[in-house]
Amino acid sequence: MLQLAAHFDVFMGLTMNLVAEPMSAQPVVDRASFYISVSDRSKVSPVIYHYIVDHAQGHTPATIRDQVGETFTQALEAIRGTPPDTIGPGFFGPMRLDEFVATRLVETRVHGMDLTDALGMPPLPMPRTTTMAAEVLDEVLARRAVPGRPADLEGDDLAFIRAAAGRGEHPDPRLPVVG
């Protein structure tokens, strides 16, 4: 659980880097290409995993909870106080803030489900976040394969997010699109 909480802290903390280092460059990464870039888990995941393990070290459940709360508060303040068209470092290249925020919403929805699943709870109700996450993953699917959700996932954003993010088996060979 500490590592999952540390992941929340790290993924939201990246927002402050983008806001703190505005660039006068053209964005080269958008919300969908961000996830296409991380889709090869064999290259990206080990680096992120080790960073998160290190980030979790020394924390207790209480200290990581406080840290994550502080990071989310700071990130939300930074987002609200920065024009959405601000361009800054977005992990894989320059990104607009609004495009980067969309990726943070996907992370929040997917890893929020990881957390509630681990606790045996239903997913937290986050309708706007769920809609945005599903839209981003729909776009990733459209760019990586044949567009369009499998028929059984039409109209069920949570089930689609779960399948598209590899949080459950689905017979469609196009899924998952991210890990």
Task: Locate the predicted segments by residue.
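Conserved alpha-helical segments that form or flank metal/cofactor-binding pockets of metalloenzymes
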Residues: 2-49
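Solvent-exposed alpha-helix faces
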Residues: 9-10, 73, 113
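Structured surface interface patches that mediate subunit assembly and partner/cofactor docking
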Residues: 17-32, 56-61, 66, 76-179
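A short, structured beta-strand-centered segment in the mid-to-C-terminal lobe
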Residues: 37, 44, 48-67
